[in-house]
Amino acid sequence: MGLFDERIAYKPFEYPEYYTEGWLKQAQAFWLHTEISMQGDVKDWNEKLNESEKHLVGNILLGFAQTECAVSDYWTQKVVGWFPKHEIQQMAMMFGSQETIHAVAYSYLNETLGLENFEAFLHEPATAERFENLVSYDGNNPKGIGRSLAIFSAFAEGVSLYSAFAVLYSFQLRNLLKGVGQQMKWSVRDESLHSKMGCRLFRHMCEEDTNLLQDCHIDIMIAAETMVELEEKYIDKMFEIGDLENLKAYDLKQFIRKRTNEKLEELGYKKLFSFDEKAASNLDWFYHLTGGVTHTDFFSIRPTDYSKANEGEDFNDVW
């Protein structure tokens, strides 16, 4: 039986990794915004951040709150509808549920910091529409499903807004906004798991349909280029007032190019983007904070890494 063949019996699982590496890991890493203390963040916001830093953080956080619902719907409606296997559907429903937790948590941050007077930083509309058109698919043709799943998993879950996550993390490395930083850490670990398992599902599709990788190649390359364009424009918008004390826009753009290459390789394709390796390496702390070590180790998240048991690390160790 293949991925698209219905199996009435719950077990035995034909694709057990979507249970053990997907559903179970996400379940073990369950968290809620109520676990995060924001008292220190409010004090930092009122007493330590300057106006340009407030402008940056406030507009980023408002943008986050507007993006999570669509991501949840993709997992719970599209993926569940396409793949009848119980182990895949369970994983997708768990991932979608976790995205709703992100939405509530971002709203909590916005309310706690009082961000009603800020305007959300969002991806540039025309370019974002081009990307959405590549993700959008409502049919049942394997090529359409594979293209949509690959682009969504690799880029929407694995690259989109990672520049903003990195900006917010950079404050925690200065011992500021630790509550925001903790939430970003848990959120990015979730997104990274979702991306990893979605890419793996695409690779499984390619194993069962040997033409699929080539059939989707052009659209996926276009999507990768579009995502890098989106992120670079977004970085320009975030840094319109100038670089941060410990983070440069140029370094962040190189990091995004490197990360997009990594996701392309995860899908089974070759790297597409050239980048400044030294500048990109200035963001190696991002891999540490999101549950990996550096580079290729990032996607081999061990159960002890992907849990809340290890959250008490000293951020001075990053250096």
PLM feature spans:
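Non-heme di-metal
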Residues: 1-319
